[in-house]
C-alpha cells in the first residue's frame, strides 16, 4: 500500500544526515539552524577591527551580555574599510585602506576564542578597500570595493580553515563600493553601495562560484551601507547610511526589504555583529565617530537599545566577525 504525500508544515524540523546539521522548513525551503556555539564564557563573541583615521586595534565583546568592549590585539598594520568574515573559530580581515587613499591586498586572520595579534593568511588577487564580506563556515568572500583603477565588480574567495591567496569567485552586477554584506549558510547578500547610490540587493550562493543575481531592493537605504549589515540564518538586517532606519529581508526568498525599526541615533558606516539572535550595531559616524553600542533582537522587530561602549570611538572598520553569525 502506498502512502499519500503530505504537505510539509512551516516550522517543521529535521536532521540532514548529508550535512550533519539541523534544518527548519520556512515555507518553500529547508534552512540550516545554528544549534551550538563555542564555549566563550557566556556566549558568542563579536569582533571589530580598524578605524578611520587608520588604526590597527581589534576589539571584542560577548554578544548576549550587555557590557563594554575589550581590547583583543592588533591587525598586522593600520587600516580601515576592508572586507571581513568568519567561521566559528577564525576571523578574517581582507584588504583595506592604510591611508591616505591606499589599497591593500593583505589578508589577516585571528583565532576568535583567544586574544592576540592577527597573523598573515595570504593575499587578495586584487588589492581593494571600501567593499564588504560574506562568509559561512567554509568560505570567506571579498566583494567589490575599489582601488586606483576605480570601483570594482569582482568577488574573491578563500577557504577559511587553510591559508593562502584568494581566487576568483565571479562578478557583481555593477562596479560598486560601500556595500553591506550579510550571510546565511547558503547565501550571501550584497546591499546598497555607490556610485549611483544604489538601493539594489544582490545574492550569491557561497558554496559555488558565479556572478551575483538580483534579489530585490532596499526601501530607503542605499549608498553607504558599508558595515551596517548582518544576519541570522533566516533574516538579514541592514542599517546605517547616516539614518536611524533599520530594514530586513528573509534570505531564502527574494523581494524588497521591510521596515524593522530604528536605531537610537543616525549612524553612518557603523560596525555590526550578531549571534543570530541578537544584533549589535556599534560605532559609526553620528556625524563624528562614536563609541556607543546598541542592540536589536533579529527574530523580532523593534528599535535599538543601549548595549555598552567600545574601547574607543570607531567607524569605517572591519566587522561581521563572530562565532555564531547567520552564515554558520
Could you say what each language-model-derived stretch is?
Residues 1-328:
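Polar, enzyme-active/binding microenvironments
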